[in-house]
Regions:
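Helix-loop-helix hairpins in multi-pass membrane proteins, especially solute transporters
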Residues: 1-113
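Helix-loop junctions at membrane interfaces in 12-TM secondary transporters
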Residues: 1-8, 264-278, 334-338
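Interfacial helix-cap and linker-helix signal at transmembrane-aqueous boundaries
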Residues: 4, 56-64, 129, 133, ...
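Transmembrane alpha-helical cores of Major Facilitator Superfamily
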Residues: 9, 40-48, 52-53, 188, ...
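Small-residue-rich alpha-helical segments with characteristic i,i+4
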Residues: 49-58, 274-354, 388-392, 405
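Hydrophobic transmembrane-helix bundles of small-molecule transporters
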Residues: 67-185
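Transmembrane core module of solute transporters
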Residues: 141, 145-152, 156-307
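Transmembrane-helix exit segments and adjacent C-terminal regions of multi-pass membrane proteins
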Residues: 361-413
Length: 413
């Protein structure tokens, strides 16, 4: 298991670098008005890849073994390397010669210490959000210690960037630009809202329809398609008009409509038409991520675009973890209380009620074993908890909309 975890760390580091680097290359090769369209194409490819990765990996694991899920990536990456070497233009000046001494000097300027403090600090802060309330209680010494360590490590990162780093991995002066801060905040909020919804939708259909994991996951496709279409349309809009604030505001409004519909209409007897209520959520997120990328580029000095883009891509996983953690925390807080109340109405209290609540919270397939009356109230409690989870997504979308309203109404030349 340790070897698998180490491999995932290496793979994730390279994958994250590739995504950010691809975005930087696009901004180098295309006019800013066209960047949104090209970035939306990149998002489409990434979405297709993420959508195919799970089913293909599962198929390989079920047929020839899970190891081939890792071996199979090697020829794909090799093909990508060859393609980049052939197709990408060489932007390095022709007469530039880099000797060993110059290369060594450049290597020494890399802010390895700042990168270490930033990476470990974020890990220490975000890890308790993943395990809190699930693996360990929120007030566990492990959770509190990780939070404290994360704060300390990020403080050391700030000191390193301000005092010691020759070329900071992330110049803190960028945060003096409110457009940069707003762009990061909108990305965090929209991603948190979308991921919170994407996590809850399969659970909803597993509980209310007793759907298999595959069928429940398939209900996410309307949101995925909406995300793709939203990104493509936004790219075309920005290319034609040069305006990016209006899509940012509209994105939050459209997403909010989706979450309101889920709260009001998903009561456990959802029909096929109502299953498309998640489409506006994906559509709004696609609009937002394309528009915010351009808003960030328009607000910064070109020499800062690489680090600014990296910060934007860092905001997305932060939002993902916050969205999952907030949704889970809301479920953990609401569902047991609601279920206990419903069980009392059935005359079930005390140790018997605690046993039912514990089993219902631990596994969805308990619904297949429980008596009909208990299964019904467990389902209702799940639905109530998910309503509050969608409320978190709605709050995030409202925050994103409010922030977008505060951004400058710029227009690209």
């Amino acid at each position: 298991m340790g070897q698998v975890i180490l491999g995932r760390v290496i793979s994730g580091s390279g994958g994250a670098g590739i995504i950010a680097l691809a975005a930087v290359i696009i901004t180098d090769l295309a006019p800013l008005r066209d960047v949104a369209s090209w970035q939306s194409y990149l998002n489409v490819v990434a979405t297709v890849g993420r959508s195919l990765g799970g089913p293909v990996g599962g198929f390989l694991a079920d047929t020839i073994g899970w190891r081939w899920s890792f071996f199979g990536q090697a020829p794909i990456f090799l093909f990508a390397m060859i393609l980049c070497g052939i197709v990408l233009p060489d932007l390095k000046p022709r007469n530039t010669q880099v000797n060993d001494e110059v290369a060594s000097s450049r290597l020494r300027r890399i802010d390895f210490l700042g990168a270490a403090f930033l990476g470990t600090g974020l890990l220490a802060l975000l890890l308790p959000l993943r395990i809190g309330g699930q693996k360990v209680p929120w007030i566990s010494p492990i959770v509190l210690s990780l939070f404290a360590a994360g704060i300390l490590l990020l403080a050391l990162f700030v000191v390193t960037e301000m005092r010691w780093a020759t070329e900071p991995i992330f110049p803190l002066r960028l945060l003096n630009n409110r457009e940069v801060v707003f762009s990061y905040f909108i990305t965090i909020c929209q991603t948190a809202a979308q991921v919170g919804m994407m996590v809850s939708v399969p659970l909803y259909f597993q509980v209310t329809k007793r759907s298999s994991s595959t069928v429940a996951g398939a209900h996410l496709m309307p949101a995925v398609i909406g995300n793709t279409v939203g990104g493509l349309l936004t790219g075309a809009w920005i290319r034609k008009t040069g305006q990016f604030k209006a899509p940012l505001v509209l994105a939050g409004v459209i997403s909010s409509i989706s979450y309101v519909l889920l709260i009001l209409r998903w009561k456990g007897d959802t029909n096929w038409v109502e299953s498309f209520y998640i489409t506006p959520g994906g559509f709004g997120t696609g609009i937002s991520l394309s528009a915010v990328f351009i808003a960030l580029q328009a607000a910064i000095d070109p020499k800062d675009k690489a680090v600014a883009i990296s910060g934007l891509f860092l905001s997305s996983p932060i939002g993902s973890i916050l969205g999952m953690a907030a949704g889970n925390a809301m479920m953990q807080a609401i569902m047991p209380v609601d279920l206990a109340s419903r069980l009392r109405n059935l005359g079930i209290e005390g140790n018997e009620a605690e046993k039912v609540i514990k089993q219902a919270m631990a596994r969805v397939d308990y619904l297949d074993e429980a008596p009909q009356g208990i299964a019904r109230v467990v389902t209702q409690a799940y639905v109530r908890g998910l309503e509050y989870s969608h409320g978190i997504s709605l709050l995030c979308a409202i925050l994103a909309t409010s922030t977008a309203l505060l951004m400058k109404n710029g227009k690209l030349n």
